[in-house]
A protein has these predicted regions:
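Right-hand nucleic-acid polymerase module
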Residues: 1-143, 154-358
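Conserved RNP beta-strands of RNA recognition motif
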Residues: 147-152
């Protein structure tokens, strides 16, 4: 079964909520018992989304929502008119699953940025999981290919073609017939297409190798010769529960800031997304604590919301502290209302004794 591409915020939320359910369903099943690292599982909880762990579906949803909003704002203001979406995958970033600890994401980010040097771009690293790595690494065990998805704007197709040609001449994609640098112009639903960049791993892949016969003509001799060309076709299917352990291990120390990349005008977009997501996650965490205190009948004094606290730190001459605290109280109250209407995660339901729907 093919997974529907994520090209809207609504699809993004549904896909990551489903991923959250699948992970926890597997964790409490007989097949998944003791498979997922116990020290990693708390990082997947909604209450710990504030840690910005890249494999936490709730963290991803907040970051995607902020990216969607900030990109729409720039489209409305005319700062972004149309865009190109670029995919970059290189053989040097492919490893067997037993060798994944040797990945240096900082180096990969710098390498990806160099491919788009002097351009305005915003995007993220993603890990493609191959359940049979033989065609890529000559090893039967699963393999991982770190690659990048980027939105590039304020450039031309001609310039991107030059960059594409230069990159593809210097670097291999890692499978026969593959291209390291690929791009496509996108003029509609740009913010929706950007959601694909922000997703957590949703699928797993396989590669089938085959031979293609092609005739060549030698103009000097007039001879026609048939040659064989190595080719590869990739197949995709929804991520299987048995693959969760490898994916969770892969992302065990990865935060959102480790995989997001930007250059040129994209740096301000990245900054806006990270800051607004951090504030939203802090507000949500505060609301969760307030709701928990209210549920067990304990008194609750809200802490200042992140932006309000930042204002307080500027000094009394720049901020009216009582007013700021009232604002923080309002923020938490609003967040509590959102929280009450939001569905609980599977583990939170498990802790409360609520049956998880199958």
């Amino acid at each position: 079964m093919m997974r529907t591409p994520i090209i809207s915020l609504g699809q993004f939320k549904s896909a990551h909520e489903d991923l959250d359910k699948e992970i926890w369903r597997y964790h409490v099943s007989a097949a998944g018992k003791n498979k997922l690292p116990p020290e990693i599982m708390p990082k997947l909880l909604k209450q710990n989304a504030i840690d910005m762990f890249a494999m936490n579906p709730h963290t991803r949803i907040v970051f995607a929502a902020k990216a969607d909003r900030d990109i729409q704002q720039r489209l409305t203001l005319g700062e972004v008119t149309d865009a190109f979406f670029v995919d970059i995958a290189c053989k040097k970033h492919i490893r067997s699953i037993s060798d994944i600890q040797n990945f240096d994401l900082e180096k990969i980010r710098k390498w990806m940025s160099a491919r788009l040097k002097n351009m305005n771009f915003f995007g993220a690293l993603d890990a493609a999981y191959y359940y049979d790595g033989t065609p890529l690494t000559d090893k039967k065990e699963p393999a991982v290919c770190w690659h990048g998805h980027f939105m590039v704007w304020d450039t031309t197709q001609k310039l991107l073609k030059k960059r594409q040609k230069k990159t593809n001449e210097r670097f291999e994609a890692g499978w026969p017939g593959g291209k390291c640098f690929y791009f496509k112009n996108w003029t509609e639903n740009i913010e929706g297409r950007a959601m694909y960049m922000m997703k957590a791993p949703q699928s797993e892949y396989s590669v089938a190798l085959y031979k293609q016969h092609k005739e060549t003509f030698d103009p000097e001799t007039g001879e026609v010769e048939e040659i064989e060309i190595d080719k590869a076709k990739q197949y995709k299917r929804p991520l299987r529960p048995g693959s969760f352990k490898n994916i969770v291990d892969l992302y065990s120390r990865v935060e959102m800031r480790d995989i997001l990349i930007a250059g040129g005008q994209g740096k301000s977009l990245l900054s806006d997304v990270i800051n607004s997501a951090a504030n939203q996650l802090a507000e949500d965490r505060e609301a969760q604590r307030a709701a928990r205190a209210e549920a067990i009948g304990l008194p609750w004094t809200p802490n200042p919301a992140p932006l309000a606290w930042h204002q307080i730190q500027k000094g009394p001459e720049q901020a009216n502290k009582p007013a700021v605290l009232r604002t923080a109280d309002d923020v938490v109250t609003n967040a509590i209302s959102r929280l009450r209407n939001a569905p609980s995660s599977p583990l939170e339901k498990l802790r409360l004794g609520i049956k998880i729907e199958s």
